[in-house]
Amino acid sequence: TLSLHDALPIYDYLTFHDFSLKYLIDKYGTPFRLTYLPRIGDQIKKAKNLFNKAIKANNYKGEYFYCYCTKCCHFSHVINEALNHGVHLETSSSFDIDLIRRLFEKGRISKKTFLIHNGHKTDDYLDKIVGLLDDDFENVIPVMDSKVEIDRLLARTKKDLTIGIRMAINEEPQSAYYTSRLGIRSTEIIEYYKQKLARKKKVKLKMLHFFVDSGIKDTLYYWGEFRKALKIFADLKKICPSLDSINLGGGLPIRNNLAFEYDYKYMIEEVVRNIKEVCQEEGIEEPNIFTEFGKYTVGESGAIIFKVLEAKQQNDAELWYLIDNSLMNTIPDAWSIFEKFILLPINKWK
């Protein structure tokens, strides 16, 4: 069983990037997980190339920064491969800061690497973020997930702070909930800046972050939330000169079915064009663009191989395969949100 693409049957067996899966099965048995590292680099290079081309084509003045979400996959070989291609890093928990420390100790990142700190900030998480500041990491950006986080952060350090704000979004119409638990309400951000952040001499607001669960998709819902975020960015920029970056949370989609189609070039061009258009309309400078890609970075690089132990025909239409592990255990994230994935046999192609 294979949950990836770029796999072709040769000699009655499926291969992955021209590598024999049968060889691995014969050597290691099943089940096992594999990662094809070159695919990670391919994905990063593709996104960087398309954003930089769109920036050049639109005579866009801001820069582009690709961030890898460490929570997506913590395996050292995966993160090291991503870092080989010049990514910056996004964290969402105190555990991720330990990982950041280890990467720095090994020389894999520098103190100039952008570190975007998202998520709810526990005391331990805040303490570790402050620890990075105290050790003179230059591009630490804690993103405020609620209005109270800034006071909790300032109580821990006398250092100057460069921060972001996360804008809460409305969920898709078919969602079970109307709002997101993360971020500050869009209608409250301007007032929050005026009444709170603007009065803090040691605080510089650099980034507006918004995250759409569906990812960057060509839908009315996505473009509606996107344009709302751009309007708030423009209004903020007019009263906050230090605001120079917009962070597009929610990644690019990956191939999860054999008929997958997505025009990456068009969507990235539209993202850049829309930002430039709003900036021209509002008379503001074009911001740097940050993206946070986790699943997009690694999702097409890995596979899990199972053995079918028994096939059970339970009625005329349903044939069940009993496998030698559990989807709940091996792909809990995909399993829990009913995510689709490619499933292919390795043998019996002829």
Named regions from a protein language model:
Residues 213, 246-256, 291-295:
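Glycine-rich beta-strand-to-loop/alpha-helix junction loops that act as flexible
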Residues 1-8:
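Short, small-residue-biased leader/transition segments that mark boundaries at the very start
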Residues 218-224, 255-267, 298-310:
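Short glycine/threonine-rich loop-to-helix capping motif typified by GTGT followed
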Residues 12-19:
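N-terminal glycine-rich anion-binding loops that anchor highly charged ligand groups
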Residues 223-246, 258-288:
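Catalytic cores of soluble, metal-dependent hydrolases
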Residues 20-22, 26-51:
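An N-cap/entry alpha-helix motif that binds or orients negatively charged groups
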